[in-house]
Every structure is written in structure tokens, then in C-alpha cells.
Curated annotation (Swiss-Prot):
Gene3D superfamilies: Dihydrodipicolinate Reductase, domain 2 (3.30.360.10), NAD(P)-binding Rossmann-like Domain (3.40.50.720)
Enzyme Commission designation: 1.-.-.-
Domain of life of the organism encoding this protein: Bacteria
Protein name in the entry: Uncharacterized oxidoreductase YdgJ
Similarity annotation: Belongs to the Gfo/Idh/MocA family.
Source organism of the structure: Escherichia coli (strain K12)
GO cellular component: cytosol
């Protein structure tokens, strides 16, 4: 594509407003051209030059739209992505990819048969702390990792009236927060041999999962993934123990908060995390503890890679095949919790 990639965005809820619209608009070589929304006033307040249409079908039928982005309620991902692909569009779907594994596999097969790029927005691969940790492991600083613990905890004791907290398909934090942690674990360590998962509704009036605790078992490693909506005290984001040392990091990547506050890209200081981690290494008989600077996060890298993939200059940053692995663990985790059992991957 020699001209700008023209992007159509479906919906203008939290994910579109906070992540996708500013990241798309801030990527050279891409144009946020059309947004499908029932609230034109809300869209125009942020993006006065963007065309607003009332229904997604107008994006599917627009021959000038190259890429359709779908950050809508989880149970709509499959039908919208399928319709967009069948209309000949390239597609980005927010996480979780779909509600079921079979839906994810069907979309992947459809995209391949049509020669379309299908990508899933697992943006937390570009978190500041995750990039720091990924670098540590690549350099072998911690040695062989035996224990990895990752938390995504919040304090929201009141159940809110929104689709993510209602009891419909794809609701709850096992579908909302856990995909981030599962994707990061797979990126670092690959698929586990087995997993043991506890899912619960702990808040009064909860209609969907608001607590999860997952143990991913590898031959010589345990990965603990934890999320709750009832954590007033701060938990460590990462606790990692290896044969040569440990890494502990508190705090959450700052990019979402900055985007939520309306900051636009590009910015020279983008992604800087002011909270550093602690690296502990054993040298001989001595234990050495040092502050480890956190590298900048880089959410803009996702849409830059999408641009390059559509132009034939690079790889899809998160192909559907990788998101399918996350869906495998989501479904296996639900079965594990249902049967209160450790289950092996097929």
C-alpha cells in the first residue's frame, strides 16, 4: 500500500477511546478515517475530522477502508471479525480474541483462506516492566527461571453496571485481565504441560468472575497468574526467581493512564516508568541487591508493526495463531475451575 492505510474503528467505548484511536492516529502511514458509533458527538469531541457512521456495515462496504479494528464487547468479536474478513478487510481484534477456541480457529482459517492479515491486540507485550523482564531473561541474568508470579490486581469493591461485570459470554476478569498475563507467560515460556485454575465471584452482587488464581506447570518451572478486584494493598506486579537471582517489580506500566488522560502521540518521553524494579543476584557467597531501571514501554510499536505487515515490510506482531494459544488456556482454565482439577493440554 503506497498511500496511508485507512482504518475503520468499530465502536467508541473505553478501549477505542483510550487505546486504539490515539495509537492509530499517532502512527505514521495510518489514517484514522472512519469510526462506527451511535454517539457522534462523543467521537467528534475527540476527533473532529473523522467520519462517523452509524453501523459497522458501512465500514465493511466502504472500498476505501483497508483495516478494520474491533475493540467491542467480547461476544461481538467473532461475528464482526468474520464479517470484516468476508468483506475483504484486514482485521485487528482486541483481546480476548474470541469467546471460544472454536471461534478463534475459524477466524484464523478464514483469514488465511482470504489472504488477509488478522491480528490480536495483546498490547501488554509492550509494557515497560514486561520488556524489562523479557530482556533480563534473554540475557540470562536470572539463570533458569524456576518460579514466575504475575499479578493484575485492582480494588473495585462495588460491582459496576457494565458489560464486563455482567454475566454474559466473555465477561469477567478471566476474559478481561487474564489474557494479558496468559499471553505474557506464553511469550516468555511457551505453553505449559498442565494448569490448575481457581475462578470465583467474591464481591457481593458479582455476576461474573472477579478473582482468578492460575498455576501453569512446566517440567522445572511454576508460573503463578493472579487477579482480583479486591486488593486494596499493592501487590508486586512480578516476582521472578531463577538459578542466578531474582527480580521483583511493583507498579503498573504508565501508558494506559497517560492515554486515558488524553495524551496524544508521538512524544519523546513516551512509556517511561518511574518505578524501577529490584534485582537480587548471588555472587559467590554474597547477595547483591540493586535497583534495575525499567525500559520504556512501547504501545505504538504494535500499530507500527501492523502498518509494516500490511505494506509487506514486516511480520504480523500478534498473529491469530498466537492468540489461539491464549484461548486454549482460557478454555482449559474454565474446565479446570469447573472440575477443581489439574488438567493437561491436549
Amino acid at each position: 500500500m503506497s498511500d496511508n492505510i485507512r482504518v475503520g474503528l468499530i465502536g467508541y467505548g473505553y478501549a477505542s477511546k483510550t487505546f486504539h484511536a490515539p495509537l492509530i492516529a499517532g502512527t505514521p502511514g495510518q489514517e484514522l478515517a472512519v469510526i462506527s458509533s451511535s454517539d457522534e458527538t462523543k467521537v467528534k469531541a475527540d476527533w473532529p475530522t473523522v467520519t462517523v457512521v452509524s453501523e459497522p456495515k458501512h465500514l465493511f462496504n466502504d472500498p476505501n477502508i483497508d483495516l478494520i479494528v474491533i475493540p467491542t464487547p467480547n461476544d461481538t468479536h467473532f461475528p464482526l471479525a468474520k464479517a470484516a474478513l468476508e468483506a475483504g478487510k484486514h482485521v485487528v481484534v482486541d483481546k480476548p480474541f474470541t469467546v471460544t477456541l472454536s471461534q478463534a480457529r475459524e477466524l484464523d482459517a478464514l483469514a488465511k483462506s482470504l489472504g488477509r492479515v488478522l491480528s490480536v491486540f495483546h498490547n501488554r507485550r509492550w509494557d515497560s516492566d514486561f520488556l524489562t523482564l523479557k530482556g533480563l531473561l534473554a540475557e540470562g541474568v536470572l539463570g533458569e527461571v524456576a518460579y514466575f508470579e504475575s499479578h493484575f490486581d485492582r480494588f473495585r469493591p462495588q460491582v459496576r453496571d457494565r458489560w464486563r461485570e455482567q454475566g454474559g459470554p466473555g465477561s469477567g476478569i478471566w476474559y478481561d485481565l487474564a489474557p494479558h498475563l496468559l499471553d505474557q507467560a506464553i511469550t516468555l515460556f511457551g505453553l505449559p504441560v498442565s494448569m490448575t485454575v481457581d475462578l470465583a465471584q467474591l464481591r457481593p452482587g458479582a455476576q461474573s468472575t472477579d478473582y482468578f488464581h492460575a498455576i501453569l506447570s512446566y517440567p522445572q518451572r511454576r508460573v503463578i497468574l493472579h487477579g482480583t478486584m479486591l486488593a486494596a494493598a499493592e501487590s508486586a506486579r512480578y516476582i521472578v526467581h531463577g538459578s542466578r537471582g531474582s527480580y521483583v517489580k511493583y507498579g503498573l506500566d504508565p501508558q494506559e493512564e497517560r492515554l486515558k488522560n488524553g495524551e496524544r502521540l508521538p512524544q519523546e518521553d513516551w512509556g517511561y516508568d518511574m518505578r524501577d524494579g529490584v534485582l537480587t543476584r548471588v555472587e559467590g557467597e554474597e547477595r547483591v541487591e540493586e535497583t534495575l531501571l525499567t525500559v520504556p514501554g512501547n504501545y505504538p510499536a504494535y500499530y507500527a508493526a501492523i502498518r509494516d505487515a500490511l505494506n509487506g515490510d514486516g511480520e504480523n506482531p500478534v498473529p491469530a495463531s498466537q492468540a489461539i494459544q491464549v484461548m486454549e488456556l482460557i478454555e482449559l482454565g474454565i474446565e479446570s475451575a469447573k472440575h477443581r482439577a489439574t488438567l493437561c493440554l491436549a
